[in-house]
Structure formats: C-alpha cells, structure tokens
Regions:
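Terminal alpha-helical segments
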Residues: 1-142
C-alpha cells in the first residue's frame, strides 16, 4: 500500500455482519460495566471505558457496512471508513457523526497518557450505543 492509500475494503456478508454485531454488543456492554466502576489515579477506568466504546463503534460500523454494502473497511485511515459508512444507507448515514466523534477520540483514549473525564467517557458510550442500535436495525431480519 502506498502512504496515501492506508486502507482497503474486504468482502463481507451476513455472517461477518452478525459476528461484528456481536462484537459491538460485547464492547458496548464492557464499556458500560467498566464505566460503572469507581475511577482512581492508578486505574484510569474512564479511559478504558471510552477506548472500549470506540471499539464498539468500529464493530458496529463494520456490521452496518457488511450488511448494507457487502464490504467493510480494513486499514489505518479511518476517514475512509467514515466515507464507507456514510454510503451504507440508511443507518450508516444516520450515525456517521457519532462515528466521526468516536474516531476523533481514538488516539487520545487508546494511545495517550491523558485523563479521560467522566463526561467524555459517558459521551463515547452514548455514541457507541447509538451505533449499536443502528447496527442491530441494519442486521435485523427483514
């Protein structure tokens, strides 16, 4: 891959959509459980909750794209993943802004030694929940 093309799509169908939907459910559940625990300086659980919420949003986006487009994103350039999700009508377009916000905090919560506020973590979990609801809608039998 060239430096400009840091992502690709892979073929995906109903099986992949179901698997990614189940992963999204698990990530969102774990984020909620971790968020409910008391935070302390040694164990920064709010950051962990937000990081897991981001993973839930990514898995939900994969589920939506798999079922609506027959493909999902793989790579480092998440702007391409946002573009793919926006094409996955109608659910992807509806939660695009939540996905953009989750990806916007990804580096902070996963790679930086920065304290995540309770408000930031709660917002990430809400965004991830909305994405999960959209993925469940997209994957529900018609």
């Amino acid at each position: 891959m060239s430096p400009r093309n840091r992502g690709k799509t892979i073929m995906a169908g109903e099986d992949e959509a179901r698997a990614r939907l189940n992963a999204a459910r698990a990530f969102v559940s774990v984020a909620e459980l971790v968020y409910a625990e008391p935070d302390d300086p040694v164990l920064p659980l709010r950051g962990v909750a937000a990081a897991v919420a981001v993973l839930g949003g990514i898995a939900a986006a994969d589920a939506i794209c798999s079922v609506r487009l027959g493909e999902m994103f793989r790579g480092d350039d998440h702007t391409q993943a946002v573009d793919l999700l926006a094409r996955a009508q109608p659910e992807g377009a509806r939660v695009r802004s939540d996905f953009v916000r989750l990806l916007g905090i990804k580096d902070k919560v996963q790679y930086q030694a920065i304290i995540v506020t309770p408000s930031e973590a709660a917002t990430a979990i809400r965004q991830s929940r909305r994405m999960l609801a959209a993925a469940e809608e997209a994957c529900s039998p018609r």
